[in-house]
Amino acid sequence: MRVPEKYSTLPAEDRSVHIVNICAIEDLGYLPSEGTLLNSLSVDPDAECKYGLYFRDGKRKVDYILVYHHKRASGSRTLARRGLQNDMVLGTRSVRQDQPLPGKGSPVDAGSPEVPMDYHEDDKRFRREEYEGNLLEAGLELENDEDTKIHGVGFVKIHAPWHVLCREAEFLKLKMPTKKVYHISETRGLLKTINSVLQKITDPIQPKVAEHRPQTTKRLSYPFSREKQHLFDLTDRDSFFDSKTRSTIVYEILKRTTCTKAKYSMGITSLLANGVYSAAYPLHDGDYEGDNVEFNDRKLLYEEWASYGVFYKYQPIDLVRKYFGEKVGLYFAWLGAYTQMLIPASIVGVIVFLYGCATVDENIPSMEMCDQRYNITMCPLCDKTCSYWKMSSACATARASHLFDNPATVFFSVFMALWAATFMEHWKRKQMRLNYRWDLTGFEEEEEAVKDHPRAEYEARVLEKSLRKESRNKETDKVKLTWRDRFPAYFTNLVSIIFMIAVTFAIVLGVIIYRISTAAALAMNSSPSVRSNIRVTVTATAVIINLVVIILLDEVYGCIARWLTKIEVPKTEKSFEERLTFKAFLLKFVNSYTPIFYVAFFKGRFVGRPGDYVYIFRSFRMEECAPGGCLMELCIQLSIIMLGKQLIQNNLFEIGIPKMKKFIRYLKLRRQSPSDREEYVKRKQRYEVDFNLEPFAGLTPEYMEMIIQFGFVTLFVASFPLAPLFALLNNIIEIRLDAKKFVTELRRPVAIRAKDIGIWYNILRGVGKLAVIINAFVISFTSDFIPRLVYLYMYSQNGTMHGFVNHTLSSFNVSDFQNGTAPNDPLDLGYEVQICRYKDYREPPWSEHKYDISKDFWAVLAARLAFVIVFQNLVMFMSDFVDWVIPDIPKDISQQIHKEKVLMVELFMREEQGKQQLLDTWMEKEKPRDVPCNNHSPTTHPEAGDGSPVPSYEYHGDAL
């Protein structure tokens, strides 16, 4: 091919824009009517105002960006350097080098310095050229820009012309709006009036977004087909495929396009993994702030969604979906629904807490513990260094325990179990509404072939396996990875997960030893104020240690889970995401909840008794619960871990890390020379600005934060009724934080179609079921609710709780202490102690079977187990009943979906009938005129208006 002379006389400043593999333009069959690659050479003088959103011609929109690093000779940007690189490219293409290609530099002069090329970089460049040539063959249009403000970084701009968009939309079965518009059935009667009133009331908190307004009409959507283009509204081809859809189509082509040299054969994913390209992303629509910024969807999202000043408004979910795609839109819709459902849970939780505050002075057990007249002397909390102590000194703890350990918490546990079931049903119904609005009904069947596209890593392993078989002269048909190929990875996964869980348990054990040793050390302190606050000090510091460890291990476990999933080599992206989610959730669940499980179910259970305590490593005596029980400590543990995790890990990191990165970039800029600094502050192209943003890492971390929080809200809600309130306050901030991160700090993600939240829904259901069981055990074994009921109905003399505290305490003769375990200062209270008390159901020292477990213990245990069984089955039944009563699909949505199907059938019936009539008319005109009129004549009807017979054609075919 010889390039026309008019394309080789470009000014030098325009030659940095070159088209890879331009030698194949004629061979590829590009026609001028379809927008040839050569059009990019006619530079629009106004194109610079587009700031990188369009090609140099100012007409073709940039749909995708590929970024690569290239080496420059001492950072220079000389034309000779570009000419040398261009000639090296041409040397691999069998193209005449005596005439420059469009946009290329002229051949290098003899005096130009020769630049040595690194073999590895040269190899990457060759692979880029081959890959970009294959993209050209796929119909995409490319434009290269290496003359950027970012040293050593080149950009490949990709544009998908109309015929490529149509072809790929048909292949992907994208549902596009047709010309047919129908009215959405409106509610009538009282329901319509209620909806109208609610709309007026909520109007101030609605976002000022066109997509958020109630729609009375809807366009009928149908999978795009080039044969049926007449059905679609193609009056404006530029806006028919929006930027989200265009980038999705280009990304699918990038994934399918292969690079056959050596092992790089799996498309853009493999090329990114091997460093051939350093990044690939679609562009944002433009800037989001500034006085002279052109209005765009990104700016609208920033003003109506991603600003803290609109925290009280509803989210413009339809606009979020339009800009980021269905998968991101579903995440924010789910987060909004979850936050909305937290409002009633928070209100009930606050009422339960206020009930505890109002009745604290009427609680007889705490009053007895605070009454110094009872003069109850308790046994030492540790060996030797700890002394005897008065129960009245734990008065504050007992009163605080009542705030969370009262009959209302049982009701709240039942309420939250039903709340979780209602939330799941509410989300399923909302999800169906979104599927209808976003034309995702029937999506799963249409996407079956596309979603099973193998991952690049899987294809690489299959290729490696097939090459091994070829070397052994074996059959290579239908090579795939079997369980034998994956067994080492599965074994590594199992061992690693068990090891990580063991590490978590070991850390919890270390914190337990810290608590025991610290309590003993503080007990030796001479200050009375220090000794009186031992429990609070030890609990608070231990929880803070747990919090720091949890935050650190969360990051470590996230990386380990991703590595373990990678070595499994899942076949599809969906399989990879599900396996990664399961591993990460398992490890982070164990990491977050193990300290809480210890306090709730193990602390104080294996202590032993005075004179026969249980020791760890024969040195550390197991911890005991406070006289009021471990529920208060569980509440402290929950609140600090939950609030600290949300404040530090979720919010502070998300705000602080981007600010820190900006500050580091500012410091680097100050170190640069004045000329480089002046060039840096110049306005960059859109693709240069987006390159400096953080890459999108998926939604798994976002979902994980909320699922762990959902666990805090539901699993131990019996001990912390304020958890929904703190979760609500956090989520109000979290929504805007995530929104601002997506709009301002992240590169625009590729829009991915999805009709649900995937495996996260099953995890939510599992957490909800587990919450019923855990709350049953917390109420039964951790709180004093069951012992109080047993005492009230079996042992109380007057039907009140008077004497309950004394009933739960056993007696111990101090002469039965083991050698070396008695207090060093037995007269610390000012008198000699002969009998001390400890919390347990055991026989007294004067009994025949002294210190054995008493009958009261077995009565309470039986009542506890009975309560667990009754509570679990009753709440499970009520949850399933709620699930059964509430239909998954709203009735109006079901009717609208049915209406769409009927309209679609009618549309195609009319189309087929019209085709048949046209065919019959054409056949009638083609009949020979010498044929008698009575042969093959149609049925006549004399009722025509003009008296002439009217032909009637019958259609017996199937319309669809």
Curated annotation (Swiss-Prot):
One GO cellular component term noted in the UniProt record for this chain: cell projection
Q: Name one Pfam family in it.
A: Anoct_dimer
The GO biological-process annotations, alphabetized, read as: cellular response to heat; chloride transmembrane transport; chloride transport; detection of temperature stimulus involved in sensory perception of pain; establishment of localization in cell; glial cell projection elongation; mucus secretion; phospholipase C-activating G protein-coupled receptor signaling pathway
Q: Which of the residues bear the PTM Phosphoserine?
A: S196
Spell out which residues lie on the membrane's Cytoplasmic side. Answer: 1-333, 428-493, 564-581, 653-699, 742-758, 888-960
* Cysteine-cysteine disulfides: C370-C395, C379-C836, C382-C386, C625-C630
GO molecular function list: chloride channel activity; identical protein binding; intracellularly calcium-gated chloride channel activity; metal ion binding; protein homodimerization activity; voltage-gated chloride channel activity
- Sequence segments annotated as region (Disordered): 92-115, 928-960
Any inhibitors or activators noted?
A: ATP and calmodulin are essential for its activation. Channel activity is inhibited by CFTR protein and by chloride inhibitors such as niflumic acid (NFA) and 4,4'-diisothiocyanatostilbene-2,2'-disulfonic acid (DIDS). Activated by heat with activation seen at temperatures above 44 degrees Celsius. Activated by BDNF in radial glial cells.
Keywords from the UniProt entry: Calcium, Cell membrane, Cell projection, Chloride, Chloride channel, Developmental protein, Disulfide bond, Glycoprotein, Ion channel, Ion transport, Membrane, Metal-binding, Phosphoprotein, Synapse, Transmembrane, Transmembrane helix, Transport
| Effect of substituting P658 to A/G | Moderately increased threshold for activation by calcium
Binding annotation for Ca(2+) 3 = E425, D883, D888
- Where on this protein are sugars attached? N806
Q: Which residues lie on this side of the membrane: Extracellular?
A: 355-406, 515-542, 603-631, 780-866
Tissue and organ expression note? Expressed at the apical surface of the vomeronasal epithelium (at protein level). Expressed in the lateral and septal nasal glands (at protein level). Highly expressed in pulmonary bronchiole epithelial cells, pancreatic and submandibular gland acinar cells, kidney proximal tubule, all retinal cell layers, most sensory cells of dorsal root ganglia, Leydig cells and spermatocytes (at protein level). In the dorsal root ganglia, detected in small-diameter nociceptive neurons and in larger myelinated neurons (at protein level).
Q: Which domain of life is it from?
A: Eukaryota
Effect seen on changing E555K: Induces phospholipid scramblase activity
Q: In the UniProt entry, what is the domain comment?
A: The region spanning the fifth and sixth transmembrane domains probably forms the pore-forming region.
- Role this protein plays: Calcium-activated chloride channel (CaCC). Plays a role in transepithelial anion transport and smooth muscle contraction. Required for the normal functioning of the interstitial cells of Cajal (ICCs) which generate electrical pacemaker activity in gastrointestinal smooth muscles. Acts as a major contributor to basal and stimulated chloride conductance in airway epithelial cells and plays an important role in tracheal cartilage development. Required for CFTR activation by enhancing endoplasmic reticulum Ca(2+) store release and is also required for CFTR membrane expression.
Query: What's this protein's family per the entry?
Result: Belongs to the anoctamin family.
What is the designated name of this protein?
Answer: Anoctamin-1
What organism is recorded for this protein? Mus musculus (Mouse)
